[in-house]
């Protein structure tokens, strides 16, 4: 059945409206991405300085091994996973890649469905696990596009506290790391115990630069939980940046696809119009011939 010219015109108008919406959403996501990238860069400066300070305190000037439990691996009976997703869709494969990876981890390390807890930041992840019979221990929804530490302080602090109280024995953060506008990289990073402070990066002369007013262990008791919390917060900022990039790319793709559909419909409309005109001319000529 042939499609009428009016139907094609209606489809073109509808697709143009959709294109305008996705283009506007793309520009909004681009603005969000710029702010997120700046926040991520600023955090990296802070994180590097805190990491260097901790490394110097732990390993500099011939310091011996610390007995702080946040630095010591223990027998693993239960694992905690912080899974960071978005609250909604329209972000391409941003959520599916991380959720697929987490389920693969579960099948590999927890095939009996025991020995792990999920802490979900983002509604898509929480809903995904609930639909599969996995009840998140905690969940957080409705983060802003540039989440402040105050927004996530409660869930982060509670998670670190649970590790300290041995409710689980290791903690991983599963999220998408922002590489560039078109690329993100799925990461599963161990946050606790803290094992990635490289002794080779320590300053052997750090004690000449500053003097500790109290014992090293007392300082570490205060500093290590804060460091762990800040690293988790950094992963959240990074994931938000990747989310905004994914949203921008998805809307750009949608806009480009809409333009292609409009072009195809326009060609279809012109052909149908040409056929209609040809048909009218043929009928006029036939009518004139009949009158002769």
UniProtKB/Swiss-Prot annotation:
<comment type="similarity">
    <text>Belongs to the ATPase gamma chain family.</text>
</comment>
<keyword id="KW-0813">Transport</keyword>
<dbReference type="GO" id="GO:0005886">
    <property type="term" value="C:plasma membrane"/>
</dbReference>
<dbReference type="InterPro" id="IPR000131">
    <property type="entry name" value="ATP_synth_F1_gsu"/>
</dbReference>
<comment type="subunit">
    <text>F-type ATPases have 2 components, CF(1) - the catalytic core - and CF(0) - the membrane proton channel. CF(1) has five subunits: alpha(3), beta(3), gamma(1), delta(1), epsilon(1). CF(0) has three main subunits: a, b and c.</text>
</comment>
<keyword id="KW-1003">Cell membrane</keyword>
<dbReference type="InterPro" id="IPR035968">
    <property type="entry name" value="ATP_synth_F1_ATPase_gsu"/>
</dbReference>
<dbReference type="Pfam" id="PF00231">
    <property type="entry name" value="ATP-synt"/>
</dbReference>
<dbReference type="GO" id="GO:0005524">
    <property type="term" value="F:ATP binding"/>
</dbReference>
<keyword id="KW-0375">Hydrogen ion transport</keyword>
<dbReference type="GO" id="GO:0045259">
    <property type="term" value="C:proton-transporting ATP synthase complex"/>
</dbReference>
<comment type="function">
    <text>Produces ATP from ADP in the presence of a proton gradient across the membrane. The gamma chain is believed to be important in regulating ATPase activity and the flow of protons through the CF(0) complex.</text>
</comment>
<dbReference type="GO" id="GO:0015986">
    <property type="term" value="P:proton motive force-driven ATP synthesis"/>
</dbReference>
<dbReference type="InterPro" id="IPR023632">
    <property type="entry name" value="ATP_synth_F1_gsu_CS"/>
</dbReference>
<dbReference type="GO" id="GO:0046933">
    <property type="term" value="F:proton-transporting ATP synthase activity, rotational mechanism"/>
</dbReference>
<keyword id="KW-0472">Membrane</keyword>
<dbReference type="GO" id="GO:0042777">
    <property type="term" value="P:proton motive force-driven plasma membrane ATP synthesis"/>
</dbReference>
<keyword id="KW-0066">ATP synthesis</keyword>
<keyword id="KW-0406">Ion transport</keyword>
<keyword id="KW-0139">CF(1)</keyword>
<protein>
    <recommendedName>
        <fullName>ATP synthase gamma chain</fullName>
    </recommendedName>
</protein>
């Amino acid at each position: 059945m042939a499609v009428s010219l009016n139907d094609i015109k209606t489809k073109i108008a509808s697709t143009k409206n959709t294109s305008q919406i996705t283009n506007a959403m793309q520009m909004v996501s681009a603005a969000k991405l710029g702010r997120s990238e700046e926040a991520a860069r600023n955090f990296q400066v802070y994180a590097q300085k805190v990491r260097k300070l901790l490394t110097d305190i732990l390993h500099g000037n011939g310091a011996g091994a610390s007995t702080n439990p946040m630095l010591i691996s223990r027998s693993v009976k239960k694992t905690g996973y912080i899974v960071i997703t978005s609250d909604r869709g329209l972000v391409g494969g941003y959520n599916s890649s991380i959720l697929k990876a987490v389920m693969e981890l579960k099948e590999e390390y927890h095939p009996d469905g025991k020995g792990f807890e999920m802490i979900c930041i983002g509604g898509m992840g929480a809903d995904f696990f609930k639909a599969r019979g996995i009840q998140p221990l905690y969940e957080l929804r409705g983060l802003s596009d540039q989440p402040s530490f105050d927004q996530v302080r409660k869930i982060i602090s509670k998670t670190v506290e649970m590790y300290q109280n041995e409710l689980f024995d290791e903690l991983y953060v599963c999220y998408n790391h922002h590489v560039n506008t078109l690329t993100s990289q799925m990461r599963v990073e161990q946050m606790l115990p803290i094992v990635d402070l490289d002794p080779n990066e320590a300053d052997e002369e750090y004690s000449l630069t500053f003097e500790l007013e109290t014992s090293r262990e007392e300082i570490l008791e205060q500093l290590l939980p804060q460091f762990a919390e800040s690293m988790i917060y950094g992963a959240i900022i990074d994931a938000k940046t990747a989310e905004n990039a994914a949203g921008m790319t998805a809307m750009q793709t949608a806009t480009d696809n809409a333009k292609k559909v409009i072009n195809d419909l326009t060609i279809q409309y012109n052909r149908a119009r040409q056929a209609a005109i040809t048909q009218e001319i043929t009928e006029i000529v036939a009518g004139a011939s009949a009158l002769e």
